[in-house]
C-alpha cells in the first residue's frame, strides 16, 4: 500500500473543500487504499492551528477533533524522527523527517513549489493533484 505524508494544509483543506484533490486523498485513506504517516509534531500542529479563529470559522471544531482523532487512531504514527534541515520553511522540516523515517513514497503538500523542494532524498514531493494523477497512471 502506498505510504503518504500529508501536509497539514492538505489535511485541513480536505474537509473545507469536499470536491478538492485533498478531499479525494482523504477518501482514499478512509477506504484504506493508502497509508497515511504522521507524527506527534503534526498532531500537535493541527490541534493548535484548528484553534485559530479564522480556521474555526471554516472548519467546525467537532470536525477538526474527528480529524485529530483519526490521525491518532488510524494513521501510522512515526516516532524518533531524524533531524532534517532542508526545507526553505523550517516549520516543514518535520514533514520531511516523517517521510524519511516512515519510508513514505510521497509527501503531499498544497505548497507551490512543494515544500520549496522537488525531492527529499529519493522521495518525490508532490501536490494533491499530481498524486491523484500518479495513482491514475499506476503510481509511476
Q: Residue locations for each model-derived region?
A:
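Short, well-structured N-terminal submotif of metal-dependent ribonuclease cores
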Residues: 1-38
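Short secondary-structure boundary segments
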Residues: 8, 40-41, 110-112
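A generic structural signal for short hydrophobic patches within well-formed alpha-helices
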Residues: 11-12, 43, 55, 114, ...
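Amphipathic coiled-coil/heptad-repeat helices and related helical stalk/stem segments
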Residues: 21-22, 64, 91-92
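Hydrophobic/aromatic ligand-binding patch that stacks against planar heteroaromatic rings
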Residues: 28, 98, 117
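PIN-domain endoribonuclease scaffold, especially VapC-family toxins
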Residues: 28-83
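Active-site neighborhoods of divalent-metal-dependent phosphate/nucleic-acid chemistry enzymes
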Residues: 73-107, 112
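Acidic, PIN/NYN-like endoribonuclease modules and their adjacent C-terminal/linker elements
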Residues: 89, 102-106, 112-140
Amino acid at each position: 500500500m502506498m505510504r503518504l505524508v500529508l501536509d497539514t494544509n492538505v489535511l485541513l483543506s480536505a474537509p473545507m473543500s469536499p470536491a478538492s484533490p485533498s478531499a479525494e486523498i482523504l477518501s482514499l485513506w478512509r477506504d484504506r487504499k493508502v497509508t497515511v504517516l504522521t507524527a506527534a509534531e503534526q498532531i500537535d500542529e493541527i490541534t493548535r492551528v484548528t484553534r485559530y479563529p479564522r480556521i474555526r470559522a471554516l472548519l467546525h471544531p467537532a470536525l477538526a477533533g474527528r480529524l485529530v482523532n483519526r490521525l491518532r487512531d488510524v494513521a501510522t504514527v512515526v516516532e524518533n524522527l531524524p533531524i532534517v534541515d532542508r526545507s526553505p520553511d523550517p516549520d516543514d522540516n518535520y514533514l520531511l523527517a516523517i517521510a524519511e523515517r516512515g519510508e513514505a513514497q510521497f509527501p503531499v503538500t498544497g505548497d507551490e513549489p512543494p515544500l520549496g523542494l522537488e525531492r527529499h532524498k529519493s522521495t518525490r514531493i508532490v501536490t494533491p493533484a499530481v498524486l491523484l494523477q500518479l495513482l491514475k497512471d499506476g503510481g509511476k
